[in-house]
Amino acid sequence: MENLVGLLRIRVKRGINLVSRDSNTSDPFVVVTMGSQKLKTRGVENSCNPEWDDELTLGINDPNQHVTLEVYDKDTFTSHDPMGDAEIDIKPFFEVQGTDIQELTNGTEIRRVKPSGDNCLAEESRIIFSNGKILQDMILQLRNVESGEVEIQIEWINVTGSSDF
């Protein structure tokens, strides 16, 4: 991947109150897309509150590019049913990457991000310093569906020899 500035690790933790698509339940999985990159979690059978705890890693060459999360109900014989989508707003996360972490103690809050029309946050999100890393936990409100949220955590991974953004 040309002009790689780093990697974005997305830990897809769990789904909350996802819609039922198959007889009072669903078999959900998540697809994360950024540009031409498309990654997916494993499916969880018979759950509207799945625990994925899967890590997906995207190569980032443009920090302003959109990251989309889509939830689907896995179907064996027909096309997968959409269960909602959300935009992952990574701009506030990238803006704090230049923070000097040498003086930070574990658990230090670097920034708060409030829900707005510019993001899909279901509640306020905190960017924190934890165990030598800058992390952001988010609960995303799914769009284009009756109900559902997805809890994720993002982490920046520096790539040796990459240029600063």
UniProtKB/Swiss-Prot annotation:
Ca(2+) 2 binds at D22, D27, D73, K74, D75. Ca(2+) 1 binds at R21, D22, D73, D75, D81. Keywords: Abscisic acid signaling pathway, Acetylation, Calcium, Cell membrane, GTPase activation, Lipid-binding, Membrane, Metal-binding, Nucleus. The modification N-acetylmethionine is found at M1. Residues 1-106 form the C2 domain. Binds to PYR/PYL/RCAR abscisic acid intracellular receptors in an ABA-independent manner, both at the plasma membrane and in the nucleus. PANTHER family: PROTEIN C2-DOMAIN ABA-RELATED 4 (PTHR45933), PROTEIN C2-DOMAIN ABA-RELATED 8 (PTHR45933:SF25). This is Protein C2-DOMAIN ABA-RELATED 8. It comes from Arabidopsis thaliana (Mouse-ear cress). The gene is CAR8.
